[in-house]
Amino acid sequence: MHPIAAVEAEMSLWSTDILHNDIAKTCAELDIPVIAYSPLGRGVLTGSVTSLADIPDGDIRHHMSRFQEENFKHNMKLINEVNELATRRGVAPAQIALAWIRTQSNKPGMPTIIPIPGGTTKDKVVQNMGGAQALADSEMAEIEAILEEHTVSGARY
């Protein structure tokens, strides 16, 4: 039998569960990398979703708890603060979201974390590959404060 080569788990500023439920810790202890899917929070961390009207009719997100009106309104507080940080840094919000994951990966006691963002255009793929590769300690502290202040409302699915 082949040993586990990687663990695929949802991870983003929108979904930090693996940092709190011992998945990341266990992967680090066993030297198993994490493949972080949906690192852009189903698109909300790209800066292109500012209201529910930005999500096309028939999109599955309309059926997800985090995208219901009250939850979405609350969750936009987190998104707006991430967008402000991106603006100050001169990068796209998606680059901040991906850099946060890369920086988590470099912390002691964390596994290697490989984000796998989607890209609907060549420009988005290029954008996701560039920009903010890692965040400064002060930026990480700012993001941690944002996450503590604005807990995401609604279940993942």
Tell what function each PLM region has:
Residues 1-148, 152-156:
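Beta/alpha (TIM)-barrel catalytic core signal, keyed to glycine-rich beta->alpha loops juxtaposed to Asp/Glu
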